[in-house]
């Protein structure tokens, strides 16, 4: 069966594919996440005793770009390139037996250093807004410069213009003092250096993770890793490295996050599927008075909480969204208290949660009307001149734009109509010749977002023509598991089931609008 045959079969039975996807969430409850260069590099340095060390080193070699860097274009490549280069230098310094020749390691590290030197010495480097980047970059630059000094190299790497090591030094002193630190910092505990080893500020979760991060967990376990093979954190790390044969994701588990997004994408599109009762029960139980985290080891956040609430309301088991008040500020809703910056996608999802609950519980709608009005106004103020939105939790403006546009289309009222129309026009104007959409190149994920916006909010012939071209592109991309990571964490990542759900939602919407789809009986 050809790739196109597979794609057509999936398109013709999106409902069955959605059902299989939902059931698959139960069999992999920690979530399905792509491996991360940054996180894998940290395990190479911090945990050479962990199963799969050689495989991790080989994976770093194999994923190096032709220019010597790692990761996505633009400033997104800095953190993974720093991590991978430092990891290879650590392997060379220790003389690890990894199955990769020393000359191969030296050449890869040298290419990484040359790229980093060029990148960091230039004034035009623009860094993305990603968690802990202001701590991660200085910590890795310090480690690399220690390697260079040991090797007698007199030209150290510099920090990007405008970045200082002072915040990192303050956090390290904070961790060493054993004073309580914000839970979100535990996700990047590895930046604390020696102070992370056994840090009293960290608490091991029931599943053995520190901060839902393999790197943070390995840093905390420290020198106990090889001597205590039965330690819960060691067991947790061993379980994670087996998922990808050595490399590791940047964050795990993402149980609530994954389930909320998958269920809401599918339900919003109207795909018929059944949810295991225990999954709905778990999702309801996860939402406490202060909200819910994406997974064990993370702090509660408004994004995961609102999407879970929205999914529950769509699926007929609404829960009062009062836990979201914990994230309200005078102007908008924060991802978590103390957030530096703000997120349009988070506020769009909060609007979804309030709006959908008010729709299914109209007797309580007045309670949430002021917040809905505030959210609408805040989102409208942040639309860019071209009609799009951008966001701190995703590299693609198509994700931010579909999040804001759909929330405003459903719950923003007449005042939001011009903004949604402008977003539709932006999507129409940015379609590629092959029918796809994408920030750097066309992807199934971003095309699915664009299609959903067009099919929910558009209607005229020009919209139908563009949507038909986008749908045809999706049919040609049979394996949606392939594609670049676009979601923001310490490194870019790809939540596979979430992306799959978004694509299935777009396919189903295209089918329901009869965009040139053959009847199921003919496929």
Positions of the model-derived regions?
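Helix-turn-helix repeat elements of alpha-solenoid scaffolds
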Residues: 14-19, 192-195, 327
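Buried hydrophobic core positions in alpha-solenoid tandem helical repeats
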Residues: 21-22, 60, 112, 116, ...
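Nucleic acid-processing catalytic cores of prokaryotic defense/repair systems
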Residues: 65-70
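A short, surface-exposed, charged and often Trp/Pro-enriched helix-loop connector in the C-terminal portion
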Residues: 107-108, 473, 520
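Edge strands and adjacent loops of beta-rich recognition modules
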Residues: 187-201
């Amino acid at each position: 069966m050809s790739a196109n045959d597979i794609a057509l079969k999936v398109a013709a039975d999106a409902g069955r594919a959605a059902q299989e996807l939902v059931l698959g969430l139960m069999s992999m409850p920690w979530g399905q996440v792509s491996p991360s260069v940054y996180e894998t590099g940290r395990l190479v340095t911090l945990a050479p005793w962990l199963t799969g060390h050689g495989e991790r080193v080989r994976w770093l070699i194999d994923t190096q770009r032709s220019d010597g860097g790692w990761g996505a274009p633009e400033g997104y490549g800095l953190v993974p390139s720093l991590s991978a280069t430092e990891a290879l230098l650590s392997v060379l310094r220790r003389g690890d037996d990894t199955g990769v020749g020393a000359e191969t390691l030296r050449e890869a590290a040298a290419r990484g250093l040359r790229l980093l030197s060029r990148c960091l010495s230039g004034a035009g480097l623009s860094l993305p807004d990603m968690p802990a980047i202001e701590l991660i970059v200085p910590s890795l630059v310090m480690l690399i410069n220690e390697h260079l000094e040991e090797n007698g190299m007199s030209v150290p790497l510099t920090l990007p213009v405008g970045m200082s090591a002072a915040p990192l030094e303050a956090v390290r002193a904070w961790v060493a003092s054993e004073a309580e630190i914000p839970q979100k910092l535990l996700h990047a505990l590895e930046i604390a250096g020696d102070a992370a080893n056994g840090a009293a500020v960290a608490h091991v979760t029931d599943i053995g993770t520190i901060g839902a991060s393999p790197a943070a967990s390995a840093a905390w376990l420290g020198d106990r890793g090889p001597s205590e093979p039965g330690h819960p954190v060691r067991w947790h790390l061993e379980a994670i490295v087996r998922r990808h044969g050595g490399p590791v994701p940047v964050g795990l588990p993402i149980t609530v996050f994954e389930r909320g997004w998958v269920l809401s994408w599918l339900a919003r599109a109207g795909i018929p599927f059944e949810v295991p009762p225990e999954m709905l029960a778990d999702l309801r139980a996860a939402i406490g008075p202060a909200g819910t985290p994406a997974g064990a080891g993370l702090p509660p956040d408004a994004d995961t909480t609102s999407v879970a609430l929205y999914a529950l309301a769509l699926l007929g088991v609404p829960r009062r969204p009062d836990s979201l008040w914990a994230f309200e500020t005078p102007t908008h809703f924060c991802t978590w208290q103390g957030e530096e910056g703000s997120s349009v996608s988070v506020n769009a999802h909060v609007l979804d949660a309030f709006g959908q609950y008010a729709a299914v519980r109209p007797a309580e709608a007045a309670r949430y009307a002021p917040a809905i009005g505030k959210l609408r106004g805040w989102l409208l103020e942040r639309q860019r001149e071209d009609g799009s939105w951008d966001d701190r939790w995703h590299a693609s403006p198509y994700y931010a734009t579909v999040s804001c546009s759909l929330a405003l289309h459903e719950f923003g009222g007449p005042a939001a109509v011009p903004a949604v129309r402008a977003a539709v026009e932006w999507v129409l104007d940015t379609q590629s010749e092959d029918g796809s959409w994408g920030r750097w190149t066309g992807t199934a994920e971003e095309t699915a977002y664009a299609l959903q916006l067009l099919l929910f909010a558009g209607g005229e012939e020009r919209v139908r023509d563009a949507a038909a071209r986008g749908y045809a592109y999706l049919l040609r991309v049979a394996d949606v598991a392939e594609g670049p990571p676009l979601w923001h964490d310490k490194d870019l990542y790809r939540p596979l089931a979430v992306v799959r759900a978004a694509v299935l939602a777009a396919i189903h919407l295209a089918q329901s609008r009869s965009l040139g789809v053959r009847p199921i009986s003919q496929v």
